[in-house]
Amino acid sequence: MAAKFRQLNEALDWVFEAPKKEQVSRLKEVASSDQTVVPIVRMGVGAEKPDWGLPEGMPEVAKIQDDIPDGMGETTLKLEWRRIIQFTNPKANLKNLPPWKQEQNWLSIMEGLHHKEAKLITAVKDRQLLKLYPKLEAILKDLGIEDYEKPKGKRKSKSNK
């Protein structure tokens, strides 16, 4: 039985500290009690490509407190999921708002989340989850995700001597 996690980043850390053989079962265990895991993983690796209507990266004006211990954020991804998923739904009332107001709503969600969860959902929005959790790529096929965005590796520059 999986331990209960308040934050999704804690659950994912628990999943990927296990040996590779156990990671799939641990992720499924976490997903059985948290409805946000499956869509977050699918969107984060690029298997689903919704239009978030938001600029890339963390908002520059975000006042994220990074000195708060795990489990002590004002809110969590689970609690905010209903609001977050509206950014991906083209028929949501949120999409009727001007872009600056949508960004303001996103900013208020980011500032309420724990800093690690804010980084996690930003990586999901930008389809960069594999950069945050590189071990996830090894188990995607076991999860049934075959079409995803592979992370672009850093190219080493050749020096001419």
PLM feature segments, named:
Residues 1-161:
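N-terminal nucleic-acid-engaging modules of covalent nucleotidyltransferase systems
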